[in-house]
Structures are given as structure tokens and as C-alpha cells.
């Protein structure tokens, strides 16, 4: 006779002593995680505090002295917002980031569905090539793409087109990899039942796959939004007209104007952080769920 394993779940602790024992047992883990979070947050906290400090205080003392002598001002933000082109640069960041997020989402989700559920020749080979493209550095494409855009005569380097296309192209391999790995975890019986009922691939993608894949799609969208919003290098190369340059480029230009005014530069840097912080905090649940689901087969 074979022994049966006890698979019953352990009951939750009910008494105070049991809860206290569990908390003490988890104490080292919580302590380590708390220290990691503190180290991660200290630079951002310092940046925020510095952005509200008077310039004279910033030059004479460290930002942590506000714990004993709190003195704050909004003058730094007022001067930065009054700088020429800041408002336009903020709008440019939105005009660059939103299309550069939506385009990869649309293309990557459709391509990932095809690679996961549509049978066609060399499907696995194509997926391996796409995965291999993840290892290609972005910098290797700068010269050929800039040359191609310039010689095309379309003026893409003087409008948003070049930035949109390059961000989309470099985002697709990761997006296809992430979403395809999530799509193949969907119930096969559900997909096959829809096909038996006469649903087309487009119908299956629209009515079944997309509603079930909201966490993965949202995670990829958040990741792409944050990446494009914080990008400096590609904006410097592909947004070659001052009128279309985003906030990241504008802040680097402020270094020449306020080279030693670190409180002003801190205010400008924190203005860039506001939108990504709002997006991530609002949608972080989808971000974590999507990454965990798409990281394994």
C-alpha cells in the first residue's frame, strides 16, 4: 500500500502568538527588502527635496538637513517653467511617446498572435531570429538609419516620423517575445473551439486573445512608455529640429544655462519624472502580472 501525501494547506494563524511568530520569522526578509527599497528611493527623495530648496541652502548644506531646518520654496519650479521652450518640450515628449507606444503594441500583439497560434512555414525559425535581435545593440543602427532617412527625401528627421519609426522598430523584438510567451499559455481548447465554430484568426485575436491578455499587453505598454519618455540618445539623433525635441533634450540644454544651479536642474529633472511615476504607480499591478506571465512558457 502506498502512502498518500498530505496535501492539505496549513491553516492561517489565528492567535496573536501565532501571528507574532510568523512576523518574526519573516522579519529578516522584510528587513532586507526594506533596506533595498530605501537605497533605491534615497536618490529620488534627495532630488525631490533639492528641487524645493533655496539655492543658497543647497550650496551650503546637504538635502538631509531639512529634517532639522526645513526651508522650502517653489521658486526653482517657477524659473524652470518660465524657461523658453519647456512647455513645448513637454508636449513634444507626449507627441513622441504616445505613438511610439501604441504602434509597437499593435504590431507586436498581432505578430505574437501569429507566432503563437497561426501555423505557417518557418514559424519557429522566424521567432528565433526575432529573439536573436534582442541582442543587437541599438547603436549599430544609428548610421544606416540616419543615412536612409536623410537620403529618402521625406524629411523624417525634421518631424516626428523618424523617432516614431526607430522606437517602434527597436521595441518590436522584446514586445513580440513577451507577448508570444504569454499568448501560448492561453487555453488551447478555447482557441480550437472558436475555430470549430467558424471564427477567423482576426476574430479569435480580437474577441478571445486580447481580452485575456490585458496584463501582458499593459506591462509591455508601460515598459515602452517609460523607455521612450526617458530616452535621450535617440531623440538627440532622430529629432534634429529644435521644435520637436522632448523634455530630456531640453533639460540637457539647461545644463548650459544653469550649469551650477543644481536646485533648478533638480526641479527640471523631477518634472520629467512626474508622468512616468503617475503611469507606473497607476498600472504597476498589470506591469508585475504581465512580466511574470510572459517570462516563462
Could you describe each region identified by the protein language model?
Residues 1-22:
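Short, Lys/Arg-rich, polar N-terminal cytosolic tail immediately upstream
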Residues 26-297:
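A structural signal for multi-pass alpha-helical bundles of membrane permease subunits
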